[in-house]
Amino acid sequence: MIEACDFLGGQEVGETVAIIGGGLTGSEIAYELALTGKKPIIVEMKDDLISQTGVCLANSSYLREWFALKKIPVYLETSLKEVKDGSIVCADKSGKEVCIECDSVISCAGYVPAPLTEKRTNTYFVGDCKKVGNLRSVIWGAYEAAMKI
C-alpha cells in the first residue's frame, strides 16, 4: 500500500488500483487513474463520496456522475480490513466481508496537520500544517496571514 502523496509524486501503480478513501483526494486520484486507462476501485467508509465541507458542489457532483457513467466501482459504507497480495478484504456496514482483486492500493484516508515548528511571534501557519483543507482554504489562509504582517 502506498500513500496518496507517493502516487502524486510519481510512484507507479498497477492496472487495477484500490483507492482507500473517497474524499476529494481519493476521488481525484481515481479520476486521474481512469483518464490514463487504469481501473480504479473506490472504498469509502462514509455513505457518500466527497462528503467534506468546502468542496464546490459542481465539482463533487460531476465526479459522482462521471464515476457512475464510466462504471467505476464505488463501495460506500465499506471499511478496509486487510491488504493481501493481489487483493484487499473489506467489510460493509452489516459486517459482510468482500474480497476485491487489485494490483495496487493507494491510501487516501486522510491526513492530520503536522507543523514542522512551534508557534512563535511573527510565525503564521498556513496550508495543511494548520488544518488540512483544499486549494481555496490555503489561498484564503495565506491571504489572511499576509494581511497580519
Would you name each region that the model predicts?
Residues 76-87, 112:
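A conserved short coil-to-beta-strand element within the FAD-binding core of flavoproteins
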Residues 7, 61-63, 70, 87-89, ...:
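Short, well-ordered helical secondary-structure segments
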Residues 3-54, 92-104, 108-149:
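Rossmann-like dinucleotide/flavin-binding elements
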